[in-house]
Amino acid sequence: MNMTFDNYEFSEPVKITKWEPPESRGLYVILEPDLYSSPLPLKPIYFGQTGNFAERGFIKSHEKYKDWTREVVKKEHLFIAIYLMPGSTEEERKAIETELIAKYQPVCND
C-alpha cells in the first residue's frame, strides 16, 4: 500500500535494510513504527530529497542516519518510501521537501 503525504503519493514503505534504491531523483521519507498512525502503522521521522537514490552509500552515509537509528529500537524497524521525480530540479524537490517538513514536523528534520 502506497503512502500519501500532502497529496504526494509515495511508494509502499520498505524496511530500510531490504531497500534497493532506483537510479532516479526524488523525495524520500524515513518512517518508524507507530501503532496510532493510519492507514499504515508508520509515522514520518525525516523527509529528504536526492538527485540519485542509487548514489553510493546513500542511506548509511547520510548525516542523519544516526538520528534515525536512535529513534527506533533496531535499525531493522526503519522504513523508507519514495516519491519519484525524474527530470526534476533540486529547487523543485527542495520546495516540496520544505512543504512536507512544515506540515508533518518530523523529529529528525531540524
Regions of interest found by a model, annotated:
Residues 101-110:
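Intrinsically disordered, low-complexity regulatory tails
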Residues 81-84:
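Canonical phosphoinositide-binding patch of PH/PH-like domains
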Residues 7-8, 68, 110:
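Short linear motifs in intrinsically disordered/low-complexity regions
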Residues 55-78:
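A broadly used, surface-exposed interaction patch
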